[in-house]
């Protein structure tokens, strides 16, 4: 994310941004909300003399347009954020229009800013400077490759070894015996030239043999590899990599690693009826006691409450910050955020237990 300009009067201000990736569009989904004013370049139909002669032909020109936001939609697979609202100026004021924001589009957002939204922009700017990571989880005959994004791990490829011509014994366990399979896996490392780190993980010794294969056949890629033990591959293997801290060793401030560790700490405290709360009412009680060390909120829960105009959540976050606690907004596109949402979307890790009523 790139910030081009910021202007504030109190908590109201306008920020000019340039998203640079799919991750940045995902962040904007939770920054732009109903009632905001957004300006961006867009195509609009314009009247001309030729239109009157040939009414079936509509000319469109690129113009800068401002809309009052009603809704947003994040389209991961088409690489865009759609912002729908009513035009605030021009001859078509009041008409509906949708702004399609893509990577490297520029937009300006004018609104009453909340502290977590400003922090989210700062995080996105910092995240663009961090190393990106590709993860290979591999076992006998099968591998899954994932790309670490700020909103979670996206599985980009799965490779299965052909069942025909299977080898047995020592030959099956040799690097040569797996050469074709390893070659297919290496060919699917689509981001190898882009990322700074590749985590190779899985059960047994096959991951080590795959790294040996890379050293011989793809030495530049092998230089980026770190190896991690996991008991499985695919989604559960990706989560093991995160829990074991492999990603944290690469980028200690990575959002996903932090959320995975926080949710584990929360669930551990809940299991022993210790220093934790979940659900809005119980968490608010802990905030009133000044007991909250870290407030955990699912992004979809926060977004939904704000769209309904609920102010309790804003005061809850503000009270935690005033008491020198931390507020962490979780991504619900990633497993820890989904688990938090199942607990009501709001929870806390406490400085001290508060007990029951």
From Swiss-Prot:
Domain of life: Archaea
SUPFAM superfamilies the record matches: Dom34/Pelota N-terminal domain-like, L30e-like, Translational machinery components
Classification via InterPro entries: eFR1_2_sf, eRF1_1_Pelota, eRF1_2, eRF1_3, Pelota/DOM34_N, Pelota_arc, Ribosomal_eL30-like_sf, Transl-rel_pelota
Keyword Hydrolase assigned: yes
Entry keywords, A to Z: Cytoplasm, Endonuclease, Hydrolase, Metal-binding, Nuclease
Needed cofactors: a divalent metal cation
EC number: 3.1.-.-
GO biological-process terms attached to the record: nonfunctional rRNA decay; nuclear-transcribed mRNA catabolic process, no-go decay; nuclear-transcribed mRNA catabolic process, non-stop decay; ribosome disassembly; RNA surveillance
Similarity remark: Belongs to the eukaryotic release factor 1 family. Pelota subfamily.
Name recorded for this polypeptide: Protein pelota homolog
């Amino acid at each position: 994310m790139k910030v081009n300009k910021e202007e504030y009067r109190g908590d109201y201000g306008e920020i000019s941004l340039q998203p640079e990736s799919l991750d940045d569009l995902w962040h904007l989904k939770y920054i732009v909300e109903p009632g905001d004013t957004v300006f961006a370049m867009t195509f609009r139909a314009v009247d001309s003399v030729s239109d009157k002669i040939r009414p079936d032909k509509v000319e469109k020109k690129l113009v800068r347009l401002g809309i009052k936001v009603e809704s947003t939609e994040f389209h991961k697979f088409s690489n865009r954020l759609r912002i729908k609202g009513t035009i605030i100026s021009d001859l078509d004021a009041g008409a509906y229009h949708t702004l399609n924001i893509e990577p490297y589009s520029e937009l300006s957002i004018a609104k009453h800013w909340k502290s977590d939204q400003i922090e989210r922009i700062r995080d996105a700017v910092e995240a663009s400077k961090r190393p990106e990571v590709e993860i290979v989880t591999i076992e006998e005959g099968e591998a899954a490759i994932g790309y670490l994004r700020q909103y979670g791990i996206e599985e980009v490829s799965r490779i299965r070894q052909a069942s025909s011509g299977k080898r047995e014994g020592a030959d099956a366990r040799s690097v040569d015996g797996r050469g074709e399979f390893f070659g297919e896996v290496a060919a699917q490392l689509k981001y190898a030239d882009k990322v700074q780190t590749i985590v190779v993980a899985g059960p047994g010794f096959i991951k080590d043999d795959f790294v040996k294969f890379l050293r011989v056949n793809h030495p530049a890629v092998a230089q980026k590899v770190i190896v991690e033990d996991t008991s499985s591959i695919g989604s559960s293997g990706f989560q093991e990599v995160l829990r074991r801290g492999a990603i944290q060793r690469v980028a200690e401030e990575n959002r996903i690693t932090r959320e995975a560790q926080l949710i584990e700490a929360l669930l551990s405290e809940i299991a022993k009826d210790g220093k934790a709360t979940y659900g809005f009412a119980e968490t608010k009680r802990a905030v009133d006691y000044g007991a909250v060390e870290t407030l955990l909120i699912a992004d979809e829960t926060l977004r939904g409450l704000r769209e309904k105009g609920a102010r309790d959540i804003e005061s809850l976050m503000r009270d935690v910050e005033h008491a020198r606690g931390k507020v962490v907004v979780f991504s619900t596109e990633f497993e820890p955020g989904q688990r938090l949402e199942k607990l009501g979307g709001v929870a806390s890790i406490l400085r001290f237990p508060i007990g029951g009523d």
